[in-house]
A protein has these predicted regions:
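Structural signature of WD-repeat beta-propellers
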Residues: 74, 118, 158-159, 203-204, ...
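Short loop/turn segments that connect beta-strands within beta-propeller blades
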Residues: 83-86, 127-130, 167-171, 213-216, ...
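C-terminal motif of bacterial Sec signal peptides marking the signal peptidase cleavage site
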Residues: 18-20
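Extracytoplasmic beta-rich repeat domains
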Residues: 25-31, 36-64, 92-108, 134-150, ...
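Bacterial N-terminal signal peptides that target proteins for export
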Residues: 1-9
Length: 386
């Protein structure tokens, strides 16, 4: 199985992408930095670092808050517990053994532990209080998506198309469920969502799948995209976005597919709209926010699927998944800027340069601010001064 990156090389303003099987070269041009009259300037409360961060590698490692502690990690295996008030270190541990740890999926905080996946095909459980390794298990495939916790289980989606449930305290495998993986897929996997005794996740073959959490029995699969075109690249239909639940409706989006709303009880589609994306979506309860494959930011009415607004001024700036901060929608880009938009209109309200290494993930919310992590490992707590 070959895996390809879904966006242009980091830091390049103009990138030629060669589709080998088609022998055609398409030029992707990054939009210039929008001119924004910022209504506020976020201020830094403290700053620290977490090793070398994730570098230029594909990674969705995100900080997580639990038990009044902020946990951060780097790709090479460094994990730290920080005081969110001042950034001071409580403990740190290095998970690198004979080879680089290549942490990539996480961090998840549950059952008084931390759970992190790796490109080496491991899931690692750490004690939240000490950083001690509780267990370390191989799962037979890269873990690029964040593990989730439900019903005493840690559920991971691997790059080989296998959803695996592990005992939260021992790491023992409880069940595994495999789905078909095409020869060519995007680099990335869907973080599952668990609710009401079910687990829902996107697959590499263009489907949203549902299973019973306790025993891993497949309930249904709903197409999100159908392979089309003459080349393998044209036929990519990965559903790498994490499903979100709003009331009795499940939402997800696929690459070369659709944004789809599905009734949780019947598994029937409520509406479908033609948006292509491999990035997580967000909701504020009434709207669904999508980053398209061209890095257009779109707001859609959750009930009807009607497009409310579209902001195309960040085209191909390799945006993070959208995050809701206060009354704003925030995305980071590959050149190290945070862009703040009005949720109702999509208009820019602020812009902030942080670090030219860029962002792999968006901000993590705290009770009194938010934390950002850059690709080179900078960790900063920011607050909004309006």
């Amino acid at each position: 199985m070959k895996r390809v990156f879904k966006k242009a090389l980091l830091g390049a303003l103009t990138v030629g992408i060669l589709a080998g099987c088609a022998s055609e070269e398409d030029t992707i041009v990054m939009a210039p930095l929008p001119q924004v009259d910022s209504q506020f300037t976020p201020s830094s409360e403290w700053s620290t670092s977490i090793g070398d961060g994730v570098g230029h590698y594909f990674s969705k490692l995100s900080p997580v808050m639990a038990n009044d502690t902020l946990f951060v990690a780097s790709r090479d295996g460094l994990v730290k517990a920080l005081d969110p008030e001042n950034g001071k270190q409580k403990w740190q541990v290095n998970l690198e053994e004979d080879v680089i740890a290549r942490l990539s999926g996480g961090i998840t905080a549950a059952y008084e532990n931390l759970y992190i996946g790796s490109e080496n095909g491991e899931v690692i459980a750490l004690d939240q209080d000490t950083g001690d390794v509780i267990w370390r298990i191989e799962v037979g495939g890269e873990v690029l998506a964040k593990p989730i916790a439900d019903s005493g289980l840690i559920i991971v989606n691997t790059s080989r198309g296998t959803l695996i449930a592990l005992d939260e305290s021992t790491g023992e495998q409880r069940w595994a469920l495999s789905t078909e993986v095409p020869n060519l897929t995007l680099r990335g996997d869907s973080t599952p969502t668990a609710i009401g005794g079910g687990v829902f996740w996107g697959t590499a073959n263009g489907r949203l799948a549902a299973a019973i959490v306790e025993r891993g029995q497949l309930i249904w699969q709903q197409p999100v995209g159908t392979p089309k075109g003459a080349t393998e690249i044209d036929r990519l239909v990965d559903v790498d976005s994490s499903p979100i639940v709003l009331g009795g409706t499940l939402f997800t989006v696929g690459y070369n597919g659709q944004l789809i709303a599905i009734d949780l009880r019947s598994a029937n589609p409520i509406w479908k709209r033609n948006y292509s994306s491999a990035t997580d979506i967000a909701t504020d309860g009434s709207r669904i926010f999508v980053i398209t494959e061209k890095d257009h930011v779109v707001a859609v009415d959750a009930r009807s699927g009607t497009e409310l607004w579209e902001n195309s001024k960040l085209e191909y700036r390799q945006l993070t998944a959208p995050v809701l901060v206060d009354n704003y929608l925030v995305v980071g880009d590959t050149l190290g800027y945070l862009h703040w938009m009005d949720r109702s209109t999509g208009e820019f309200v602020a812009q902030q340069f942080v670090d030219d290494s860029g962002f792999a993930v968006g901000p993590t919310l705290l009770s009194d601010g938010y934390v950002i992590t850059t690709r080179n490992g900078d960790v900063k707590k920011l607050t909004i001064n309006e």
